[in-house]
Amino acid sequence: MSERTALNRRALLAATGMAAAAALAGCSDGAPGDGDGAAEPTDTPTDDPTETPPTEPNGSLPEGSPSSPTERLRELVAGNAGFALDLHDRLVADEDADNVFVSPYSVSMALAMTYAGAAGSAEAAMRETLGFSLGEETHPAFAELQGELDDRATTDAGPGGGSGDDEDDEIDAFRLDVANALWGDAGYPFAADYLDLVDEHYGGGFNEADFATDHEAERERINEWVADATDQRIEELIPENGLSSSTVLVLTNAIYFMAGWEQEFDPDDTADATFTALDGTGSTVPMMSQNLRTDYADLPGAQAIELPYVGGEVSMVLVVPDEGEFESVEAQLSGPTLFGVFEALGDASGDLRMPRFEYEFDAELSEALEDLGMAAAFGPGADFSNMVETGGGPGIDDVFHEAFVSVDEEGTEAAAATAVDMIESAPAESFDLTLDRPFLFCIRDRPTDAVLFFGRVVDAGSAQG
């Protein structure tokens, strides 16, 4: 284990870095011109990994849209959950799929910035595939959701209001950082209205790039921005040769999450145990253990449990299928059924044993997105005319996604005490749950039900960092 990984294991309960990038290549009718009419780019990269600033919700809604911002937010979250499970199903369909971990929120936000420039069949394909049923209202809805998430995020204090100056405050902190940026080729005729929309609703600053002359140097610059935005967890989102001289625009989203459990695991209770992988092989893993009171559900063919993070507004929900039922339960999960799991959770107390795990996942998502229905948005014939002053605009070439997750015992005493104070009613039921077999998990924002991350662990032995 590297020195950095060891340090973070001591310092964090859960650290998650996630990034997505959509690279667009120019086509003949949208090639760079002499710069006339093009939006004026900035020369300074927006490389501070700060939270995306919220914008005020748009007060007027088009005909057929939800009647209030709250309904608009609900519709966005529901569409994103449906896309999350569709994407997960497509990724695990690959023969070599093992442990998978993605951020549907990150992928959706990067593609939403791209969607803002789409027209015609490309716009229709993206709207259907990504669950953007709000149409143009998708953009203020994302700003509204990000404003909600900004309310959860603190970077300088734990639940006890610490100063952030000592190690304990760092451990106790809840941190949720989201950053967006656009990297556009100098002289390409990007429409000012498009850049203004992305900046207003996503905080995506425009950075001038020179892909034609030195795309490799620009790749390294973008990767450095992503690394900074994910606390160095994602260091090479765009692989070598991932960009080319025909690249005209790269849209990036990075999300970094760190938090402690409200109810911590005692490291002294962690012991080696056997985890049986999906293929039936066994491996020895460090199994954490605690007796706790939390929300739990006994479902047909599975059990589910919720573990809140510091503050109680963001949590991890784990779905543990019965032995031999993993593939069946996984195949049945959809946006509505996942929300059904959330609704089924209720107050309970009992014993929980779950493995420590840490792993990385990366994927080039173009093929998966095309298979899900987005083919019209890829290639030189795609219609992104709303992105440029003249011509058809660039088409999507690649969508890169990389993720890191680390979960262990660390938490805070103050958070655990707060959790006890919040519980007043008697337990509805009891449980005894051991995650010694494949399981699914997500990290969700409880007030909005937004699914920030979704993954599966089918081989805990290979997920030990």
Model-inferred region functions:
Residues S2-A19:
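N-terminal secretory signal peptides and thylakoid transit peptides that target proteins
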Residues E40-A78:
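N-terminal low-complexity, Pro/Thr/Ser-rich intrinsically disordered segments
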Residues V314, P321-L345:
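Internal alpha/beta scaffold segment
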